[in-house]
Swiss-Prot record:
GO terms for molecular function: unfolded protein binding. Its main location: cytoplasm. The lineage of its organism: Bacteria, Pseudomonadati, Pseudomonadota, Betaproteobacteria, Burkholderiales. The keyword NADP does not apply. It is found in: Cytoplasm. It comes from Paraburkholderia xenovorans (strain LB400). This is Protein-export protein SecB.
């Protein structure tokens, strides 16, 4: 086997919007409200091993905007990517899948959410950058430091 075949390999095969939904339960009346909405953002990361070296990473963003107690809108988007990861030590795959891949996908998710919100007639909401390393470390701590949050590339 040549040295080239044993070199670490990381490749983005595809980035795609897997799912998106937008609800405006109080439209059109909510557009007449003068109060600034409160905004809540949740982000989640999941990983699934599709083949020995191929992973689907899914970053889900949920944004809820409320004016008083009324929901102005609720949007959920799932940005996905298929990554080919080869010749990387097993202990490095989980951080790669839990930190590097979501960091690559998040700008696409942020753009898709911002676009949908403005197309729905609301002022733009720009999601702040997310420190996926901190989220990854927090998940590990919550799991009691179990070895490999996704030993076979399963959930984060």
């Amino acid at each position: 086997m040549s040295d080239e075949n044993n070199q670490p390999f990381f490749n983005i095969q595809r980035i795609y919007l897997k799912d998106m939904s937008l609800e405006q339960p109080n439209s059109p009346g909510i557009f007449l409200e003068q109060e600034m909405p409160s905004v809540e953002v949740e982000v989640d990361v999941k990983a699934e091993r599709l083949a020995e070296t191929v992973f689907e990473i899914l970053v889900t963003g949920t944004v809820t905007a409320k004016v008083s107690d009324k929901v102005a809108f609720l949007i959920e988007a799932k940005q996905a990517g298929i990554f080919d990861i080869r010749n990387i030590p097993a202990e490095q795959i989980d951080p790669l899948v839990g930190i590097a891949c979501p960091t690559i996908l998040f700008p696409y998710l942020r753009s898709n959410i911002a676009d949908a919100i403005t197309r729905a007639g609301f002022p733009p909401i720009h999601l702040a950058e997310i420190n996926f390393q901190a989220l990854y470390e927090q998940r590990l701590a919550q799991m009691g430091g179990q070895d490999g949050a996704a030993q076979n590339g399963v959930t984060h």
